[in-house]
Amino acid sequence: MNQLLSKSFKPLVVAGVAVIGISAFSGNRAYDEYRKERESISKKMINDLNENKITMFDYFQECKTLGRDEQLSKLNKLSKVYNKQKLNEQENQEELIDLDLIVIGGGATGTGVALDAQSRGMKVALFEKYDFSSGTSSKSTKLVHGGIRYLESAIMKLKPSELTLVKEALRERSNLLNNAPHLSRQLPIVIPAYSIFDASKFWIGCKLYDFFYPFNDIPKSYLQTSAQTYKEFPFLREGLVSSVVYYDGQHNDSRMNVSLALTAAQQGALTLNYTEVVELIKDDKINNNNKQQQLKGVVIRDRLTGKKYSVPAKCVVNATGPYCDSIRNLDDPRADPIITASSGVHIMLPGNLIPSDKGFLNPKTKDGRVLFILPFEGKTLVGTTDDPSPIIENPQPLEKDVEFILDSIKEYSNPNVKLDKSQVLACWSGIRPLVSDEPAAQGDNKKSTSQVTRSHSLRMSESGLITIVGGKWTTYRSMAEATVNLVCSKHDIFTPKGCITKNLPLIGGEKYYNTLNQYLIKNFNLPEDIAEHLAHSYGDQAPFVAKLANENGSNKRLVEGYPYIEAEVTYGVKKEYACTAEDIIGRRTRLSFLDHDKAEIALPKIINIMAPLLKWSNERKKEELKNSQNYLKTMTSK
């Protein structure tokens, strides 16, 4: 008993008693009317659809957005040849400005800001230097979570800010799962306990996690016997006492990011990838007592054609994640850095290590971290590391990081489990944009990045540049809402509507239903794995991908062993702004994340499909192959 009531454990015991004492007040969640309506999508209509009493066009609505060339044409009309004298002498400068907001950065946060602002009635343009989700947002652990380890930090180290972060993330977890049900799912995660002390500690911690989200749309945590745990996870070493199972969410991060960009475009925003901001446009208006020119727009360069556009706007938001300081330095060369960068390495293993519907958490690795082992797209995703990192483009995992992850799995594995680098199908490194009041020098190993807060930071410069940075995937929507609120208040922008993104379905989510894959099998004669993949990747747009596949005979697989088909390449170019083969293997499909070697095999076929659509010459095709192979090098360790 003394051990259980040790000093380090007392906060958890007290908190656990509190949870048990007041859990009766949590009650059942009264689902809001919107969610009720979404979950009861015309059962009769779905039955009629499945029985072919109505056509797909009576139920599904194809997403309509401007193509990239159409968006550039519209941008050209908006673009003004910047003349400093004319801008300063204009009696009504607002007449020169057609856009309310420019967003720099096409990751989760940037596309979230663009969608929030455009859906309120603002006129928005978003510019991304590379592809949507090409940076940090595609390289996550794929979890939609409150952050159970941050809860431990909040309680054990008495950090109220961490508790606030957990509560916000738990609320946003539900919003994300509801708005993109095809791209996300609830996922039970098992925490193994090798002592009664650990079992008690983990159980109380998970019950606290439940308490801070006292609604019934996410199942509650529970204790599980060692026998059941061994049955599900036979790789575990002997000595298990029990395990605790808690619930979080999982999503396809890149597909989610692309859906955000498409939804913003459907709302009317200009969402352009491969457009780099090379200059900030300013006038000579003095902001109060600060001798700082006011920001009035940006100059962008189309990286595919080299053409430049000067684009005025009332406000500019910097949402470039770990690269935000470079934009801040464009605005003010004196600006101090605010980013403490951290690298997060993940590896992909074959799918036979854990169940397809349950994850595993190593609660404490040998250096005090946590490690997730998760099912993802038929494989096993393992990660992550958390080390200081230089801020570079296209980071590559280090051999030592891959070995660390493999060793961390072995800590909980029985001797019969053989794991080595030869089984790693792919690996990647993402850079977390952590915000620190006292940023460490990049690569400074004396500062533990795992101790830097995951909260976001929102700030405005003297020129009016608004920077949003930090946070995590799960809280992208609330971060975007806070950003647009600041845009409206600081730049006096009136919007006819308030924020509606809490209940705004993303492209593919509005009319998705759980048996859509069966409809695809029956009506398009698709193999089961391909139908399942299309339903979960495209949601209610999947029938249009399947229809395209049947019409032009592009229902063949891109590579054996995976459900990706040729029609997805055409669809990605025509409907999802894919401009390179890398976009296809990395972000429209997830092939490069699942299997580096198979992605390389698929490249020639993908390039041959894209070439006539994008008018590539033979020389351009060779260049594309080389560029894509260079990208694939970042999906292996060095």
From Swiss-Prot:
GO molecular function, one term: glycerol-3-phosphate dehydrogenase (quinone) activity
Mitochondrion is among the record's keywords: yes
Keywords: FAD, Flavoprotein, Mitochondrion, Oxidoreductase, Transit peptide
Gene3D superfamilies, per database record: Alpha-glycerophosphate oxidase, cap domain (1.10.8.870), D-Amino Acid Oxidase, subunit A, domain 2 (3.30.9.10), FAD/NAD(P)-binding domain (3.50.50.60)
Catalyses which reaction(s): a quinone + sn-glycerol 3-phosphate = dihydroxyacetone phosphate + a quinol
UniProt entry tagged with the keyword Oxidoreductase: yes
EC identifiers of the protein: 1.1.5.3
Swiss-Prot/TrEMBL cofactor(s): FAD
Annotated GO biological process: glycerol catabolic process; glycerol-3-phosphate metabolic process; glycerol-3-phosphate shuttle
Family: Belongs to the FAD-dependent glycerol-3-phosphate dehydrogenase family.
The protein's name in its UniProt record: Probable glycerol-3-phosphate dehydrogenase, mitochondrial
Record organism: Dictyostelium discoideum
